[in-house]
């Protein structure tokens, strides 16, 4: 399907973005196509960079996402794709589900996992050493805005301040008490994470993170 869409896009000379890649083969097709198609971009989720299909051996529906986790070889290819710039975006995959729909057997449970709150800390904890902080910020902030043709904020005198304030080294434990989502479909409660967002400044107005 990826190759089909690439061929159609090449014919129409349009803009095409693949949201969440999960396989090495798809990535290889896109890597080749990017050499001739300028308006082509792609992303993957933070979860596909951290987990492979071994995580669902116990049929834990907290890790049931779509596209599904692939092999370790696929995951390593995605990591390399982020590092070498083939993959432009790292997404949170945030897809909350109601508790009633997840308290069922694996085959009946919906796809999805909450991820917005922990996407950046997960990347700092598990990917920073491999791809670096600058690449994480590029894939989570700058590239998405560029792809959507939105203005990328700059820090310059006379301009409104738009930024996120975070401590990349602060450790904290993600649990049900500090979960900001109304849903709880995640297998990451209890995880110790690096990186804490203190707040944001939007158009020079400060919005503090109420969590401590």
Which functions belong to the PLM regions below?
Residues 1-13, 83-84, 89-90, 95-168:
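His/Asp/Glu-enriched, well-ordered alpha-helical/loop segment
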Residues 1-90:
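Histidine/acidic residue-rich metal-binding segments in metalloenzymes
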Residues 16, 43, 93, 123, ...:
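Residue-level signal for inorganic ion chemistry
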Residues 26-27, 50, 98-100, 173-174:
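Glycine/Thr-rich phosphate-binding loops of Rossmann-like dinucleotide-binding domains
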Residues 56-64, 101-109, 180-184:
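Short glycine/proline- and charge-enriched loop/turn segments
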Residues 63-74, 110-114, 186-195:
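A short acidic, glycine-rich active-site loop
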Residues 108, 160-212:
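C-terminal cap of metal-dependent C-N hydrolases
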């Amino acid at each position: 399907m990826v190759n089909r869409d690439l061929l159609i896009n090449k014919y129409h000379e349009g803009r095409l973005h693949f949201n969440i890649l999960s396989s090495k083969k798809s990535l290889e097709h896109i890597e080749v196509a990017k050499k001739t198609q300028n308006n082509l971009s792609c992303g993957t989720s933070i979860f596909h960079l951290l987990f492979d299909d071994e995580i669902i051996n116990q049929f834990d529906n907290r890790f049931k996402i779509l596209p599904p986790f692939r092999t370790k070889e696929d995951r390593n290819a995605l990591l390399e794709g982020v590092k070498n710039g083939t993959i432009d975006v790292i997404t949170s995959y945030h897809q909350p589900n109601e508790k009633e729909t997840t308290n069922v057997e694996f085959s009946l449970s919906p796809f999805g996992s909450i991820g917005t709150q922990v996407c950046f800390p997960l990347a700092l904890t598990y990917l920073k050493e491999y791809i670096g902080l600058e690449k994480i910020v590029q894939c989570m902030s700058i590239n998405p805005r560029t792809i959507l043709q939105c203005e990328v904020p700059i820090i310059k005198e006379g301009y409104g301040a738009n930024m996120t304030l975070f401590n990349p080294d602060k450790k904290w434990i993600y649990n049900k008490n500090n979960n900001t989502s109304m849903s709880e479909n995640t297998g990451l409660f209890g995880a110790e994470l690096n990186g804490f967002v203190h707040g944001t400044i939007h158009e020079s107005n400060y919005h503090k993170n109420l969590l401590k």
